[in-house]
Amino acid sequence: MTARNVKLKVMDNLALDVKHGYRTSMSKTSHANTTVAVVCNPTSNKGKGAQVGGHVIDLLRGAGRKHGFDVIDVTGTSFDDSLANARRRGDEYDYLVAVGGDGMVALGANAVGCSGKPLGIVAIGSGNDFARGLDLPVNRVETAVEGIVGAIVRGTHIDVDMRLVTSLPDGHAIDSTDGTDVSQSRSPIDRYYAGML
């Protein structure tokens, strides 16, 4: 296996006290020319993912007007399209916010891994294991967005260790659809894996 260690910057909620709001006064520093990208799964939960994604974008745009940052949507028509959009448009944003469950966190990690751009997580999936492991808000959209805004304004994040796997030379895979040996025909792996120990 060919792999290397990398760090993922995850926007934390250290700036947020759920009961009282921000722990310290927010910086009045302008974040002009700062852009936050949002990616969600529009087909999840029979379209409810798109509704929540739209709500997150609205909340971030409201905060952006107050704190001086812009918000763009990089969501595609599928997981692969969204990942391609987030990667292709990476020079257009400074932060990426993934809205969804562990699958969308994986998409976000694969989009910004090694870029140094922080990943915000609005955990609204069925499991949300990654967010739970970091003590991020789960199924609390407004609280998650408020914490993300605090992390943007204060410049805080958590470093999460990951491995970038680029190949599995000794690996062997079977295509379950027709039993064809695909170990030689597939493209090399280029995925980030993060986890809690």
Feature-to-residue mapping (PLM):
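Short, flexible micro-motifs
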Residues: 50, 103-106, 128-130, 138
